[in-house]
UniProtKB/Swiss-Prot annotation:
Zn(2+) binds at residues 334, 336, 494, 509. It comes from Acidiphilium cryptum (strain JF-5). InterPro entries: DabA. Its cofactor is Zn(2+). Belongs to the inorganic carbon transporter (TC 9.A.2) DabA family. Forms a complex with DabB. This is Probable inorganic carbon transporter subunit DabA.
Amino acid sequence: MTNKIPSSWPNPQALTIVMDRAARAIPPAWPLASSVAVNPFLGQTEEPLAKVGARLARVAGARVTMPRRWYAQKIAAGVISEADLEAAIASAPVGSRSVDVSTLKSAANAEALPPKALPTIAELAAYASGIDWPGIIAERFGAWAAGYFDEGQALWAAPKGKRAYAAWRAVAAHDLTPEIAGLRDFALNVSEAPETALAIVERVVARLGLPADAAETYFHQMLMTLGGWAHYARYKLWQAELAGGADETITDFLAIRLIWEEALFLQYDAEIAAAWRGVRTAHAAPVEPTRDIAIDAILQAAAEHAAQRALAQTLAEHSPHALNDRPALQTAFCIDVRSEVFRRALESMDPRIQTIGFAGFFGLTTSHRRFASDVEERRLPVLLNPALRSYSGGLEAHAKDQSTRVKTRARRAWGRFKLAAVSSFAFVEATGPVYVGKLLADALGLQVSPPPSDPSPRLDPAPDLATRVETAETVLRAMSLTRDFARLVLFVGHGANVVNNPHASALHCGACGGYSGEVNARLLASLLNDAEVRGGLSRNGIEIPDDTHFVAALHDTTTDDVTLYLDDHPSAAHRGDLEQARLWLTSAGKIARTERALRLPRAASDASLPKRGRDWSETRPEWALAGCQAFIAAPRRRTAGKSLGGRAFLHDYDWKQDKSFSVLELILTAPVVVASWISLQYYGSTVAPDVFGGGNKLLHNVTGGIGVVEGNGGLLRVGLPWQSVHDGERYAHDPLRLSVCIEAPREAMSEILGRHADVRALFDNGWLHLFALDEAGRMAWRYAGDLQWSAIGNLDAPAASQRLKVSV
């Protein structure tokens, strides 16, 4: 058996490069405490959907489109028209245009064979021996990884401080489970393995005879077989690089997985050698979509064209006249699709109410410490680093801070006592009856958790006046709020108040890093109520009237209740304004709940919705962002009074106030990217739930405090649970790539895309669709890739009439 790397490798550095590429093909997964949506195709956005479909079929047996019956049903119902099919064919790569409408219709009614991944050595060995080696690997790796990554859940945590590869070797060298299952001398082989991950990868590549052109997809497959553990390791690398460092965990994982492959290959060489040679050859072949995958990609494009046609019709509807008088109330909400329903309901209360859409972190990238806590919460988009630090409370709350810390420690100690191996059984026998009342109250949903009510947050250290003025000006200009201020302006963050839900943070604000948005809203309200800051803004051309008062609020997206943080900045002069605002918000909440109840299973009326978040057994307290289809950056008058069904991210933007297009650049590179992550996570969890979905909530167990497994162990599940995209009978989410509609000059958008290759790749390769709105707010131009635009005219027209390309 040779230990020499095959001659197809050009140089020693090539192996490191391929290992790194495989690692970056895995998307990161954030821990449960601050989980955010992640694009599961993050490592493949340089390729179009069909090619990624071929790649993921090879390494994971994953689909990237829906089953064909889904498209067939939409064609039969008239949702997808012949014009949509023609447009999809016309927009397909040249090599995929050898189909016509008739072919597509026939294909939609004939389900293609599901993709099947190339077999791993573990699978070949399982076939040869009858032993479930992939299952054993998943179970043993998961048991070790749960302890290695533990964030405080385990009572007996694994030792910290070692790199993943070294820590695993220390455990695996004494783990006899593989040998009991039939893998001879595995523990001994692990103890004698090279000391570094790179050295073991070099040895395995040599022993398996793995050529260079086969390694990338094979290494990618190895990491995919580790499920969410590889995703969490990728998160460690993401966080390290964001801070300017590095992390080797994910390449250590690759080495660990390859040790298993090597051991199984050595034991079953005679039985599987011929099959392995065929697998190697298949891995070395270029990644190209099959005809079935190409057809599926065209059907997917047709479904998206149909949705865009419906959106264009909605945007073309008559808009109400713009408000000329001073608004009675201005409310700035997060761009989250759930806010669209509430904003529309609130605006229906009075024509003098103006709502604004802006990213829910309100432009303040802060690392925050909650009251009586030393935990740093990064309340900002995960793409960014915090520029500010903040905390809740101050010297006046010191005594309460200390008493709260003592109570928290006591609760933690009591909780660990209840779960400890020695005391847990005696605890249940001795104190079980005492908990009957609490158990009944919780089980019946009688306990109502209050909204976050920490003392007013403050920046620490406090920036100087010039910085505070600059920050305030940047935020106001970014939300196009520079004039015509109301007497009362609300900054409304959002969160979700739910119980018995490990994925609760996924219901919070993605722009706030998986936390609720009240901290950022309260900080901004404090900043703009500062008289010195207002004076600086006035000198810079933003005149805020003396009678304008800013108040922070929190929208509970499960109940549609809104909490106002009035104690931060009490104002007797605005008592009447606040009472009226409360009435409007309460009425709007009822309207929003009524609309949302139509989509939720077993929601008989709006009154039943608040109970869902308190119900232990409720797997769907709300739909969160299911159904998201569009991102619209334009003045609110373009969408006001038009029902977008809670399916659109709405960002206020007036390009005529954006002289340098710096706000446009910010929108394209931050909110649009975050929205794409959300949209594509829902997409991936729907089309490939076994690979990119979070599994079944009914089977979830939290492990390590960082994620969930199904059952008693094994692979970490990432992505959205099935109950988040399906109501038990039908899909709650139509997996459509996001349509981004922006009212701005095409030249400006092209120039920005030209400066940001990663963002441009999302549009050039079809992971996002980009449209330019005209001066009437209608979808007039489609981005055609390569910094070119197509005039789209009537979206109902056949595609041939839409092929005019204009370079700008």
